[in-house]
Regions:
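Short glycine/proline- and aromatic-enriched beta-strand/turn motifs that initiate or cap beta-hairpins
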Residues: 18-66, 71, 82, 92, ...
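Transmembrane beta-barrel outer-membrane domains
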Residues: 24-26, 37-41, 78-84, 134-142, ...
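Membrane-embedded beta-strand positions in outer-membrane beta-barrel channels/transporters
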Residues: 32, 45, 88-90, 142-146, ...
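Gram-negative (and chloroplast) outer-membrane scaffold detector with strong preference
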Residues: 50-146, 151-157, 161
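Gly/Ser/Thr-rich helix-start
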Residues: 149, 165-167, 188
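Extracytoplasmic electrostatic interaction patches
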Residues: 162-173, 178
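Outer-membrane beta-barrel "beta-signal"
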Residues: 178-190
């Protein structure tokens, strides 16, 4: 009788876990907000993800930055570029079987841009050479990859940690060499 009772309890716990997994899998859309980027670099980062298969999803992440510290460093000559925006379409593959807590791998593209500054040598009408600072804008495209971990609370609230890097490909003399995707995201799945 004890064995039958233990077997019944194990089966009921398993069926409850399956119900939670199915409830999460039935929700196909998710919005997220990056808390870490806002705190550390005054960057607003929003993401939308659409779950299109059992272990596969696609999405878009947008970042807008207006960090006073980065702008001050840029104006004082400590850096020659400052990123202002990013649009990152991505595709993700879940690496774990669970739908409520899982690791994932991501491939992303990044259309990014910002301000660029360089010191150039000019010659005036009297053939006198002088140096000046020239500010301009840059845009670039990067490809990269990320790894992350996501968990759900109450089948709707998402907590995600992601770390990834990409390399700018087209305008490398003005844009940063590396694009990073590091974040601690809070989201809502519906």
């Amino acid at each position: 009788m004890k064995k039958l009772l233990i077997l019944f309890l194990l089966f009921s716990f398993y069926s409850q876990a399956q119900e939670k997994e199915n409830a999460i899998a039935a929700k196909k859309n998710e919005f997220r907000f990056d808390v870490l980027s806002l705190i550390t670099s005054s960057k607003i980062s929003l993401s939308y993800e659409r779950f299109v298969g059992k272990d596969f999803s696609v999405g878009l992440n947008t970042n807008f930055s207006s960090s006073n510290k980065l702008n001050k460093d840029f104006d004082n000559g400590y850096r020659n570029n400052v990123p202002k925006f990013e649009f990152n379409p991505y595709a993700r593959l879940a690496l774990s079987k669970s739908k409520s807590r899982y690791y994932f791998a991501e491939l992303f593209g990044s259309y990014n841009g910002g301000d660029f500054k360089e010191i150039i040598r000019l010659v005036d009408n009297n053939n006198v050479a002088y140096y000046t600072t020239l500010k301009s804008k840059y845009t670039d495209f990067a490809l990269g990859g990320s790894l992350g971990y996501k968990m759900y609370f109450n089948q709707k609230i998402a907590l995600e940690f992601i770390v990834g890097f990409g390399k700018n490909l087209t305008n490398r003399e003005k844009s940063p060499d590396v694009i990073s995707r590091v974040g601690l995201n809070l989201g809502y799945r519906f």
